[in-house]
């Protein structure tokens, strides 16, 4: 019999711009920040009884190699008896970490888990494969920041290897999402995020990152990707990235960013035993596959699968956190799900276009934000969903306690 699973605490670092304030911080150190904060915020917990640390991370080609979850928990000061594992479903890695924790606890295999995600896109290295022969000269240097590398020729022949902005333009073409609508969606995200930041909403979920340097310490305590003063006119002037007849621009797409997130999940027994406060209940998670060329539409079948499983409808949710990989896919997804473009439930404090998209952390960030927003608004249920590179979608639902 499945057991109820609760989210008891959740924090994140600020989200840094590419090459910004967090670029000097290693991914394993960055991942340790929110994990350590959870430990310090909950001193009554016997952390030697933590069953697992699940962290999502998408790239894993640099300092985030060798199981960054395990390294992060050790760097955070947890006992070496606590195990950790890194999950990779690209953009949804952090959401998968939360979902994996949920399933472990629901099945009775775990009682107390930390889940979350991390990505340092600024520090993603250039890599090169080994030569096929001695002194070979055909090697190619690959940028691991985002997108395809070491492409399988069969994959390319069968499915194509469209870059992420190309997949967004494919969705815009297939679902008739105009440039004007995309720019309006992006402006809404920036304005809402700007208002939320000015009101101090994000301060409730952020733990500062302290960076030590030759001239002393620098404290990073606020998201730095936002452009709340942008306008429709400014967005309209940006050139499409895939050619003049296309619609996706740097202004209506998410950023390339750095950040990390961690949440405590527990069974009812662990909540009582460790003196935790149950803030939200995880209702379930679902995933689905779509054609890689239109990966951005992936949330639609994932949400439908989850809602059918839970016997709920979109109307039953008070907060909908949709990862804004691109405005084109965000609008296509909401329209396919019967959600109005101006529905106030969707990303009420802005989304990834404004806040940024540190790949492995973003899915966990959606869950964290949904829990905070439900508490702030008094809503009951939150729906979190996101598209995934190579053609997938993931959705996860929570309910305020």
Curated annotation (Swiss-Prot):
Biological processes per GO annotation: 3,4-dihydroxybenzoate catabolic process; beta-ketoadipate pathway
Catalytic activity: succinyl-CoA + acetyl-CoA = 3-oxoadipyl-CoA + CoA
Pfam families the UniProt entry points to: Thiolase_C, Thiolase_N
UniProt key word Transferase: yes
Annotated InterPro entries: PcaF, Thiolase, Thiolase-like, Thiolase_acyl_enz_int_AS, Thiolase_AS, Thiolase_C, Thiolase_CS, Thiolase_N
Disulfide bonds: none
Superkingdom of origin organism: Bacteria
Keyword set, alphabetical order: Acyltransferase, Aromatic hydrocarbons catabolism, Transferase
Activity-pH behavior: Optimum pH is 7.8.
UniProt pathway annotation: Aromatic compound metabolism; beta-ketoadipate pathway; acetyl-CoA and succinyl-CoA from 3-oxoadipate: step 2/2
Enzyme Commission numbers on file: 2.3.1.174
Listed GO MF terms: 3-oxoadipyl-CoA thiolase activity
Subunit structure: Homotetramer.
Function field: Catalyzes thiolytic cleavage of beta-ketoadipyl-CoA to succinyl-CoA and acetyl-CoA.
Protein name: Beta-ketoadipyl-CoA thiolase
Species this chain originates from: Pseudomonas knackmussii (strain DSM 6978 / CCUG 54928 / LMG 23759 / B13)
């Amino acid at each position: 019999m499945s057991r109820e699973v609760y989210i008891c605490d959740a924090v994140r670092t600020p989200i840094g711009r590419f090459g910004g304030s967090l670029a000097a911080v290693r991914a394993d150190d960055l991942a340790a920040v929110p994990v350590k904060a959870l430990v310090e915020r909950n001193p009554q917990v016997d952390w030697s009884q933590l069953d697992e640390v699940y962290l999502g991370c998408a790239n894993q080609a640099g300092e985030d190699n060798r199981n960054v979850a395990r390294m992060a928990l050790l760097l955070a000061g947890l006992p070496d008896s606590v195990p950790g594992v890194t999950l990779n479903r690209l953009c949804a890695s952090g959401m998968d970490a939360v979902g994996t924790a949920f399933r472990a606890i629901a099945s009775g295999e775990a009682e107390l888990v930390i889940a979350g995600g991390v990505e340092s896109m600024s520090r993603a290295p250039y890599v090169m494969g080994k030569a096929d022969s001695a002194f070979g000269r055909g090697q190619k240097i690959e940028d691991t920041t985002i997108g395809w590398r070491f492409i399988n020729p069969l994959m390319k022949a069968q499915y194509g290897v469209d870059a992420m902005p190309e997949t967004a333009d494919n969705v815009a073409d297939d679902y008739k999402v105009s440039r004007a609508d995309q720019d309006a969606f992006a402006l809404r995200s920036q304005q809402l995020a700007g208002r939320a930041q000015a009101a101090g909403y994000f301060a409730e979920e952020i733990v500062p990152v302290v960076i030590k340097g030759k001239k002393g310490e620098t404290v990073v305590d606020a998201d730095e990707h936002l452009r709340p003063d942008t306008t429709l006119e400014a967005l309209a002037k940006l050139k499409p990235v895939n050619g003049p007849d296309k619609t996706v621009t740097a202004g209506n797409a998410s950023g390339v960013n750095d950040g990390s997130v961690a949440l405590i999940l527990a069974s009812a027994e662990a909540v009582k035993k460790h003196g935790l406060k149950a803030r939200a209940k995880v209702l379930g998670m679902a995933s689905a596959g779509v054609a890689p060329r239109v990966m951005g539409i992936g949330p639609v079948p994932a949400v439908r699968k989850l809602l059918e499983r839970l016997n709920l409808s979109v109307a039953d949710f008070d907060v909908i956190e949709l990862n804004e990989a691109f405005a084109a896919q965000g609008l296509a997804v909401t329209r396919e799900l019967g959600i109005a473009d101006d529905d106030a439930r969707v990303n009420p404090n802005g989304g990834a276009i404004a806040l940024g998209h540190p790949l492995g952390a973003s899915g966990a960030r959606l869950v964290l934000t949904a829990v905070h927003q439900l508490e702030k608004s008094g809503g009951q249920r939150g729906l979190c969903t996101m598209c995934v590179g190579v053609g997938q979608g993931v959705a996860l639902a929570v309910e305020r306690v």
